[in-house]
Amino acid sequence: MAKKFNEYYLNWDEINQIIAAAKNLKESLVLKILARTGMRRFELSKLEAKDVDFERKRLFIKKGKGATEKDPKSRAVPIDDDTLQTIKFYLGSRKTGFLVQSNKKSHDGISLSQINRIVSNCAKRANVKNPNPKLKNMNPHIFRHSFSRLSLAAGIPFNMVQRIAGHADARTTLQMYGVPSITDTQQLYDEKLVDKFQEKSKNKSNAKLTDFTGKSE
C-alpha cells in the first residue's frame, strides 16, 4: 500500500544536519523556524520583526492559512532559545520591517521561492534526501509534517500540536497525524513487546525450534 504524503517525514538527526549546512544567518534562521515551529512558508514570509516576543519566547503569526480581514487566523507559537538567539543576531539593531528580508529588496519579506531554494540547497549540502521518493528536492512542507509527527511522538497532546500548527479543526490534526507511521509502530513494537514475547515464551515452554523440524502441523 502506498504511503500518504504526510507519512513521509525527517527525523531530528536529518533536520539538524540540514540546519548545520546553512551558509549564513538567514539560511539558519529560515530552517530553524520551519523545523521548530511547523510554520507554513507563507506564514514565515509574512513575519515582521515586531512579531517576536523575546521575553515570553513566542512568535506571533498574524496571517495564517485562510486569513481574511475579519478573521486573520492569528496565533502565537513558542520558540526555543537557540532560534531566538539566531533572530537577535540576524536582526542586529533592526526593530521594524519583515523578520526575514528578501535578497533583492531589503524592505520586502523573503519570497516563497527563496524559502524553497534555502531548504533545497541546504538539504543537498547535507546530503539528506526527501523521504518521499516521488519528490526530487527537499521542500519546506516536509519540515511541517516532520514537526507534527515528531511532536506527537514526543508526547505533545493533539490539541497543542493543532494550536502550534494552526489547524482550524483538531480533526485535521487527527486525520493527518493520528495514525502512527509504520516506522514508529515498528520501533515501539520492538521496544515494548518483543522482549515480553520472549520472556513469556521462556517461562511457558522449553521447546526449541529444532524440536519442530520436519513437522508441518
For each predicted feature, which ranges?
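Short, basic (Lys/Arg/His-rich) helix/loop patches that form interaction surfaces
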Residues: 117-163
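C-terminal catalytic core of Y-nucleophile DNA break-rejoin enzymes
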Residues: 67-88, 97-121
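Short alpha-helical segment immediately N-terminal to, or the first helix within
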Residues: 21, 33-34, 150-151, 163-164, ...
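Short, polar N-cap/turn motifs at the start of nucleic acid-interacting alpha helices
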Residues: 52-54, 156-176
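Basic, Lys/Arg- and aromatic-enriched nucleic-acid-binding interface segment
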Residues: 8, 12-41
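C-terminal secondary-structure termini that scaffold catalytic or DNA-interacting sites
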Residues: 2, 9, 191-217
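Short, charged phosphate-coordinating catalytic segments
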Residues: 34-56
